[in-house]
């Protein structure tokens, strides 16, 4: 009989078992393939039972993955808690000051924190704050025996957690309440909440700092630590926006490591730093005298140090130092040499000036003559200008520094301006017109061009030679030739021409609007040249009635306020007008006293609105230098040969130099 194994024969004599057995026997026999290499480290008897569960082919939703996911979540929670514990140990919280650190014992074990080894005194003590009356008749002494309930930011989270726990389970609330009552002694007295214990720690300090007299608490702590008042070292700025370079900063509740690190962190921001670090029950107290590279206000300083020190701004005292207090300067100087201070940078000049022996010897008494000499050299006769400008040089001038330290500054300024005006008036009265023009020319810086003045006169159809002759007699003060009148319509440059000349000569302006006063001519007594601008018909009538002798160039009498009458020769006078005084018969007696020049053409302007012909001090200086001989002005070399002094005026006493 043929072998039908592995075929699909249909013979009836072949049973199902035989046909099926043939297939299974073939598969069972072929258990090893030809050419396969079996590793020596494998077990020949290994049937692969350990790889049965390698592929998870369980149906979804049988409930076993819930336990596995829960295990993973618990492991992750344990890891996070371990990391959080390490962080709390080595990295302080950025949201709380170290004054909250003592409350950690209470948070971890409130019952252990309630145990006290010492006795709590029942005597009444002086309180900085008055406790509110509870309404149950307890006295202040009774209230003092038990801690008061204070809710601060550092305990809010724990209290909220306990409250939610009690509200969530009513049965446990009752059980806990009975247990606490038994621990308290079983006398039925209601136990204090757990949050009341935190006030005994450093969190009570936060409640004090948040009170209305927070600054008083900090000032008291400062005096307790440093032995002197904070206000003795600083001056007060009412506004927090006022900028200053030097600041005195005291910070409370700083971590020890941060307090040591601020000595290096503050150096790139400032030019000078004086730092003192002292321990305190709130943490470390840092006192700094800082000179920043740029001026800062109180808000900027507070924000910067709050970031560096990790302390809220409410724990800081920030004020500028006293710059003129010798005790304050001596404190900073002496503490800088001790071992409790770390100093960086160059000592500020206000400390050096008040502590060093050399600078102390250089302090001199204020001399009014030096102030007058300075005002004379800078041509300052106004009191406000003198006070401000002289105060600016106090850092480089010892007399100015003594002036600022004086209590009579207003008197000194007034006296200095008065004396300076007297010297200027005497100097001007002594000079001739030639000397005065030379004196004014020496004060003008730069060189100009005299041609624009000549071109402007020609543009107005004014002959230059007749004008030059009249101007020569005008400067010499010849009788009836000492008044020049410039007549013409509006916008012809009359006032522009006269004002430029008056500015160069240092003259004065009188106005007919003040003619109702007896003293309106008083400025003419202190000038070499005057100007009456825009004379009207009423003004010409007044001049014809009262000022004929003034136009003559003779001696006249002038009334001065709070002074006696003064007799003087009227200085050369310029008058601008829109009325021709030579054409009106009412003023016929003024015709021989006036020299009139007519400006008939409008003053030309550029596209920018500036005059085409520039009339400034430099051009007038060039004009006088060019026409010095034509105007018959005296040569300065001739004046020195006649014995006139060539040295500048000096009002400060000194020693005469003698040649050996």
Curated annotation (Swiss-Prot):
Main location (coarse class): host cell
Pfam families given in the database record: PPV_E1_C, PPV_E1_DBD, PPV_E1_N
Reaction equation(s) it catalyzes: Couples ATP hydrolysis with the unwinding of duplex DNA by translocating in the 3'-5' direction; ATP + H2O = ADP + phosphate + H(+)
Chain intervals for the UniProt region annotation (Disordered): 1-60, 128-196, 635-660
GO cellular component, one term: host cell nucleus
Post-translational modification: Phosphorylated. Sumoylated.
Sites of Phosphoserine modification: 93, 97, 109, 122
Superkingdom: Viruses
SUPFAM superfamilies, per the entry: Origin of replication-binding domain, RBD-like, P-loop containing nucleoside triphosphate hydrolases
UniProt-annotated location(s): Host nucleus
Domain named SF3 helicase: residues: 462-612
Biased composition (Polar residues): 136-163
GO biological process assignments: DNA replication
Compositional bias annotation for Acidic residues: 39-54, 635-644
Location of the motif Nuclear export signal: 108-117
The entry's keywords: ATP-binding, DNA replication, DNA-binding, Early protein, Helicase, Host nucleus, Hydrolase, Isomerase, Isopeptide bond, Nucleotide-binding, Phosphoprotein, Ubl conjugation
A single MF term (Gene Ontology): DNA binding
EC number: 5.6.2.4
Positions with biased composition (Basic and acidic residues): 169-186
EC category name: isomerase
Binding site for ATP: 488-495
Similarity comment: Belongs to the papillomaviridae E1 protein family.
HAMAP family: PPV_E1
UniProt name for this protein: Replication protein E1
Species, as recorded: Human papillomavirus 29
């Amino acid at each position: 009989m043929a072998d039908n194994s592995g075929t699909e024969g249909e013979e009836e004599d072949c049973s199902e078992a035989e046909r099926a057995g043939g297939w299974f026997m073939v598969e069972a026999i072929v258990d090893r393939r030809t050419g396969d290499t079996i590793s020596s480290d494998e077990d020949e008897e290994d049937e692969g039972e350990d790889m049965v569960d390698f592929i998870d082919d369980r149906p979804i939703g049988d409930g076993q993955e819930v336990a596995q996911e829960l295990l993973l979540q618990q492991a992750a929670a344990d890891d996070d808690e371990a990391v959080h514990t390490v962080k709390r140990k080595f990295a302080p919280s950025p949201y709380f000051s170290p004054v909250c650190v003592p409350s950690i014992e209470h948070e971890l074990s409130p019952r252990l924190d309630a145990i006290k080894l010492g006795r709590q005194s029942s005597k009444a003590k002086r309180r900085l704050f008055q406790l509110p009356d509870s309404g149950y008749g307890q006295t202040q002494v009774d209230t003092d025996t038990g801690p008061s309930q204070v809710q601060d930011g550092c305990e809010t989270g724990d209290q909220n957690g306990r409250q939610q726990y009690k509200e969530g389970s009513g049965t446990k609330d009752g059980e806990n309440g009975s247990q606490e009552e038994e621990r308290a002694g079983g006398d039925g007295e209601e136990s204090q909440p757990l949050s009341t214990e935190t006030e005994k720690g450093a969190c009570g300090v936060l409640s004090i700092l948040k009170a209305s007299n927070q600054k008083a608490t900090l000032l008291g702590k400062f005096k307790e630590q440093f032995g002197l008042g904070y206000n003795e070292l600083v001056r007060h700025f009412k506004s927090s926006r006022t900028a200053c370079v030097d600041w005195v900063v005291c910070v409370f509740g700083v971590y020890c490591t941060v307090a040591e690190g601020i000595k290096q962190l503050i150096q790139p921001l400032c030019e000078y730093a004086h730092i003192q670090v002292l321990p305190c029950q709130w943490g470390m107290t840092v006192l700094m005298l800082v000179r920043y590279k740029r001026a800062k206000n109180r808000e900027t300083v507070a924000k910067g140090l709050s970031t560096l020190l990790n302390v809220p701004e409410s724990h800081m005292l920030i004020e500028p130092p006293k710059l003129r207090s010798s005790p304050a300067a001596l404190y900073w100087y002496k503490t800088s040499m001790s071992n409790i201070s770390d100093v960086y940078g160059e000592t500020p000049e206000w400390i050096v000036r008040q502590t060093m022996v050399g600078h102390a010897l250089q302090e001199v008494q204020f001399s009014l003559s030096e102030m007058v000499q300075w005002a004379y050299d800078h041509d300052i006769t106004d009191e406000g200008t003198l006070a401000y400008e002289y105060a600016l040089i106090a850092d480089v001038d010892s007399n100015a520094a003594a002036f600022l330290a004086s209590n009579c500054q207003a008197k000194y300024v007034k006296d200095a301006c008065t004396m300076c005006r007297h010297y200027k008036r005497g100097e001007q009265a002594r000079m001739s017109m030639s000397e005065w023009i030379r004196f004014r020319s020496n004060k003008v810086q730069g060189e100009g061009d005299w041609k624009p003045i000549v071109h402007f006169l020609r543009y107005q159809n004014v002959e230059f030679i007749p004008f030059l002759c009249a101007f020569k007699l005008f400067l010499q003060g010849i009788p009836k030739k000492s008044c020049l009148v410039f007549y013409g319509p509006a916008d012809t440059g009359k006032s522009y021409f006269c004002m430029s000349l008056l500015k160069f000569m240092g003259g004065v302006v009188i106005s007919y609007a003040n003619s109702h006063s007896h003293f309106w001519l008083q400025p003419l007594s202190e000038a070499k040249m005057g100007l009456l601008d825009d004379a009207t018909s009423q003004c010409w009538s007044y001049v014809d009635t009262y000022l004929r002798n003034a136009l003559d160039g003779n001696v006249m009498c002038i009334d001065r306020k709070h002074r006696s009458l003064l007799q003087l020769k009227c200085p050369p006078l310029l008058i601008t007008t829109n009325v021709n005084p030579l054409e009106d018969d009412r003023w016929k007696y003024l015709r021989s006293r006036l020299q009139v020049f007519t400006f008939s053409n409008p003053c030309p302007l550029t596209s920018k609105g500036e005059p085409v012909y520039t009339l400034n001090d430099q051009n007038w200086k060039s004009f006088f230098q060019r026409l010095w001989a034509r105007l018959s002005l005296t040569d300065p070399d001739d004046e020195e040969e006649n014995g006139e002094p060539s040295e500048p005026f000096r009002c400060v006493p000194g020693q005469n130099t003698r040649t050996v």
